[in-house]
Amino acid sequence: MTGDDYKFGRASYVSISDGSSKADVVISDHVWIYGALQSQNHGQIRLGKYTRVGVDSKLQSVESIIIDDYTTIADNVVIADNNNHPVSPSFRLYMRMTSDTDESRRWKHSAHAPIYIGKNCWIGQNARINKGVTIGDNCIVAANSVVTKSAPANCIIAGNPARIVKTDIDKVEAPTTCKGYNDYVR
């Protein structure tokens, strides 16, 4: 873990287990974490500068989760680059008959694919981002959405399963009455 001025909330934690190391989790400058970062089998987690991870949110990686700069992840969001379980009924049954520490319970036995979330995105409360998804810069994922497919930059994604409901949000006018905003954008 690297970076300056990062902050961990009260119930937050970083879990580095099953073949992963501290080098697999990279936290950039000015990051606030109030949820959990979980890495197994060298699963990479990269948080860009000024990223926020909300209360009870979980980033679970066995491959790669990259969250670019200035992205906000609201409370109770799950971002998992794996299924957390195998699909095979017989293997799932076997897992249930083993101890919690048995090797069969590791995420590497489930399907997995990398996740990338671009710059300046907002991931709404209770959303879920599934394996293999890429979300472009400046996107909003609505609360309670389940994202199973990638989305281009500058759009709003909503629903279960999530779909693009608005595009070109980079063309939406910002409020000019916000104190300090006009100085900020110059």
Task: Provide a role label for each language-model segment.
Residues 136, 140-146:
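A generic "structured core" feature
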